Amino acid sequence: MSQKQLKEAFVSNLSGTSVLEVTQGLCFPAFCILCRGLLIIFSQHLCSFLHTWTTQFFMDFVVLIVPLVITLTVLSSFILLENLTVILCGAWLLYQIYHRRTCYAKVPVQKVFASFLKISLESEYNPAITCYRVINSVFTAIAILAVDFPLFPRRFAKTELYGTGAMDFGVGGFIFGAAMVCPEVRRKYTEGSRFNHLRKSLYSVWPLVFLGMGRLVIIKSIGYQEHSTEYGVHWNFFFTIIVVKLITSLLLIIFPLNKSWIVAISITVLYQLALDFTPLKGIILYGTDGRGTRVGLLNANREGIISTLGYVAIYMAGVQTGFYVFKRRAQVRDWIKATCWVFSVAVGFFISLNIVQVNVEAVSRRMANLAFCLWVVASSLMLLSCLLLSGIVLSFAKFLIKGALVPCSWKLIQSATTNRQSESLIVEAEKNKPSFCLITALNRNQLFFFLLSNVATGLINLTVDTLHTGAFWTLAVLSIYMFANCLVIYVLDLQGKTIKFW
């Protein structure tokens, strides 16, 4: 077998891991983000630690990126233990901050909590959603290279037909995250007709057409390894995003924003019925001729084309989630209720997933069936609830330390009884503070980070024999690869540059 065939076989015919293990792995970065915020407060105001852009970058890289690299490689069998360790570290940091607090120093704990619950959280964007999207981007960047090394567990790679591998979450999670911040949710198009909004949406996808065609041409011209049952012969991630964006833009013109959940459920159920009671499933698996040939546009790309329906449903679920999370809430207690609600819905979806897998069909990324949609939405909501909870805990730590500033976190506003001058000072202090933050940098240039990671992955695969690389060199390559990618994005953010293609 050629090197290309060996690499294709290495990522083929896999069955994935348990839903629980994937969920534990997804929640792990949320707790790392909490620890990072608590560590910043602890070091800034209790240890007189000097924060320059270099020290902040190294702190972010070590606390946010390195643990995820290790989790996906050498410590992949100890995800639960890693979660518990990070939670305990966070609890210790919070304990230290509380007992060295500069605000409410001599006030009983009950009154401290009562005062905190009356605080408002001001934010031009929701840090939990920002962190959700960044986590998905970082996870994808690590996984697309790590999967070609033996150190990366095969159970985390994409499954062949049925199952839940960690990488199976990637595209669905990306689409869910994009939906939460889509223009319709952010009320970006507030003027003009609905068809004018559709025209703007059509215009916004042309860079993706360029990127999708560019990737197709490059992959075919250099003979790079492919997994044809993932999307098909010509289809790729960018084409899926294009079709999903076009269909959902039309749906959001027809249906009210707050009814997106009804659209999502309707599409998913009807699509599953079509899979069960029409030849659609057979077409996805074996083509129109029943022999699995790749002749003709539909047969060549049947997985990518048909599975788009499932991703449309995921997008609409993301729109509904964004609509709910971006609602204005007066006090911290309202955000606690919202977090509990998101968590409860996530649990409900996991229960529904179990029922569907037992009685209807198992999770299949290849078909993006009902179970897959339930799994992606449930996992996304669970991650989001962990991030919301982390944000609330971090806000409590900031509340205890006067002048505490943490990039990419909620800004605190005193209650209505506090004078307006002190309120504005709190917000302005955070606005005027330089943001040395890897999360903010990655969020600013997410698409460029994804492209940079893909190019670097391709170059490494063409120059390194990944199939026969030991554990030490695998970790070295992955660490250098992520360090270089993150540093480029970080420097761009320091210079105030956003790389756009339109």
UniProtKB/Swiss-Prot annotation:
- Give UniProt keywords alphabetically: Acyltransferase, Endoplasmic reticulum, Glycoprotein, GPI-anchor biosynthesis, Membrane, Phosphoprotein, Transferase, Transmembrane, Transmembrane helix
Q: Which residues carry this modification: Phosphoserine?
A: 415
- UniProt pathway annotation: Glycolipid biosynthesis; glycosylphosphatidylinositol-anchor biosynthesis
Q: Name one Pfam family in it.
A: GWT1
Q: Which residues lie on this side of the membrane: Cytoplasmic?
A: 43-48, 98-131, 182-201, 258-259, 326-337, 395-446, 493-502
* Gene Ontology terms: cellular component: endoplasmic reticulum membrane
Q: Which gene encodes it?
A: Pigw
Residues crossing the lipid bilayer are: 22-42, 49-71, 75-97, 132-152, 161-181, 202-222, 237-257, 260-280, 305-325, 338-358, 374-394, 447-467, 472-492
Task: Give the protein name, as stated in the record.
Answer: Glucosaminyl-phosphatidylinositol-acyltransferase PIGW
A single GO BP term for this record reads: GPI anchor biosynthetic process
Which residues does the annotation flag as glycosylated? 13
Query: What's the EC number here?
Result: 2.3.-.-
